């Protein structure tokens, strides 16, 4: 799963980065087996992402604040445990993300190099 993240407009980019890195990320990995997480990557946009010359040359839309990549196995917890943790997870995401502006992609990984 890959998510293109935009921060809650009530937060500064630094507040978003801090919460995602220091609160949400560690919280998500406390019980990785519940969701079946086996690999979790956070890509934090640079603070000057909105002035990136390549993005300007391509007439790109406003920069995302980050990208999340999660690779999963089948969850090992009960459906009830997964649902309960998912509800907690969503509450935290509502705090720091602009959820409607943060698209999520699910797909098949095809390694080209590496």
What are these regions (language model features)?
Residues 1-114:
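Macromolecular interaction modules
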